[in-house]
Amino acid sequence: MRKFSRTGNLPIRRLAGLDAIDEAVGRITEMGRPAAFVQGVGVMDAQTFAAFEILKYTAEQVAKHDARMIVCNPLPEIQPISEEIVRGAYIKVGREDSYNPDDVRYLADTSLRAAVLGIFQREKVAATFLFGNYYHESVIFAEAGNVVGALQISGTANTHQLPFFVACCDYTLIGEEIFAAGAYLSRNPAQVGSLVAQEAAKFFAVAIILIGAIMVTANNKSLVDLLKK
């Protein structure tokens, strides 16, 4: 974290799904149809904050191209945050007059599924961005996007929903990639430092497992005995 704060540089690979966002924005601009950004379903967790960073980047790209994006929020507490993120994106690129607050919508949990499907159908969205905490809604929204021919980019850390996103979407951030994407886009020292530390811990754990397996195969149990202490 200190190194990133000092140098502003830590090696984080840019994910293919992030490049696809630029492709999707170009698509909605050429087709003259809006995009839809759905921030998961009714639970606010770490995935929600990662989705905020992706929303910020996407909104800036949409604003630059003077295109339109409808943001669907499942929780009242994230509605004002989303409004400020999208409004800030338009201000940043000098298009504040193009910002439409009606395109950032709170959809109550009881009506969320029907409301999102209605938006997809009525607006004939050309691209969908499905990021955040998803359950069975993943297949509902992704299939609805397929019906209208949208280019779809998704991401969730809920591994039990990933098969539906992978099957239905053009690009998917798999598992913890959504957190990596959020850290990559935000360049926040705390997020980047946490991400790098987690990855380093994973490499260390894998190395210990491999070394231990080799040593046990060679009938050397010194590492096993050490870890038991």
Task: Say what each PLM segment does.
Residues 61-63, 67-113:
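Long, charge-dense
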Residues 115-123:
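Short, well-structured alpha-helical segments in soluble
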Residues 1-9, 96-99, 161-163:
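Gly-rich Lys/Arg/Thr-decorated short loops/hinges at beta-loop-alpha junctions or inter-strand turns
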Residues 24-25, 49-66:
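Histidine-anchored nucleotide/phosphate-binding helix
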Residues 1-15, 215-221:
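Hydrophobic alpha-helical transmembrane segments of small proteolipidic membrane proteins, enriched
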Residues 166-229:
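C-terminal functional extensions of proteins
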